[in-house]
C-alpha cells in the first residue's frame, strides 16, 4: 500500500518486491496498477524508503503476476482442503523525470519543510489537493525521530496506457534497514483496508512486528455460525509462519459422522529461514494499525 491521492483513483492490489542487488544496493518494485480507463490529471503517490534512490526504470506489467504467484504459492500451502535514471538536482533533491512520470527522493524533514515547492518541481500544482495531502497524508510519511526518506511519485496522464506500468527503484538503504511501505493516508474511521502482497529477500525475521500486525487483522465477516477466525504462530525447520485464517467444518456427504475442516483466507507473514525471504499476504483485510514494516537486512 502507499499514500495515494486523489483517493478516488482506482488501483489494483498492491504488489511489492524488495531484493538485494549488491551489498550497497537494493531494488524496490512497487506496483499499483491504475484501473481507471483514462487519467485526466496527475496522480500523486508517496511511500517511505530506507535510503536515497539512485535510478528509476519502467518494467513490463508481466512482472506483477510473477511476483504475486511467488507469494500466493506460499500461502496456498496453508489452505488445505482437508486438515488434521537521473534528470537533475534542484534544492539538493534528486529528480528522475520521464514523459509520463516524475520521481524525487528526500528526507521526510526536507519534504515537510518544502512540500509545495517540491510538488511544483514535479509540475503538480493543484492547490486544493496539495492542502489535503499535507493534512491527511504527510503525517504518516514524516517520522521526525528517524527521518526516513520519502519517495514522491507523480504519475501523469498516459502512464496508465501500454505494457510498462511497473516502476522499479534502485536505492541505497541506510542503517541496514528495509521499509516495506504499507502505511495509508489517515482517515476518520480509524480502520484501514489492506490488499497487498510482498516479497522481500535478504532480511531478518521479526516475530514481534509480525505478531502485532496479524493480531490486529480483521478478516472478512463470517456468514455461518461454524466459522471461526483463528490465529497461528507456527514454526518448522525451514519456515516461520504467523497468520490468521478463517476455519469452518462441513459434514461428509457419505455420512454425518465424518467431518471436514477447511482453512481459507490465510493472511499474514511467512518467513523462509533458508533463503531469508519474507512473504506477506494481506488480502481484503482491515486493521486499526496504519504503519510500515521495518526490517533489518542480512549483513
Swiss-Prot record:
One of its GO terms (biological process) is symbiont-mediated suppression of host RNAi-mediated antiviral immune response. GO terms for molecular function: cysteine-type endopeptidase inhibitor activity; cysteine-type endopeptidase inhibitor activity involved in apoptotic process. The keyword Cell membrane does not apply. Keywords: Apoptosis, Early protein, Host-virus interaction, Inhibition of host caspases by virus, Inhibition of host innate immune response by virus, Modulation of host cell apoptosis by virus, Protease inhibitor, Suppressor of RNA silencing, Thiol protease inhibitor, Viral immunoevasion. Gene3D superfamilies: Baculovirus p35. Belongs to the protease inhibitor I50 (p35) family. Functions as an inhibitor of the host RNA interference antiviral response. Inhibits the insect host cell apoptotic response initiated by the viral infection. Blocks as well the activity of members of the caspase family of proteases. Required for late and very late gene expression. This is Early 35 kDa protein.
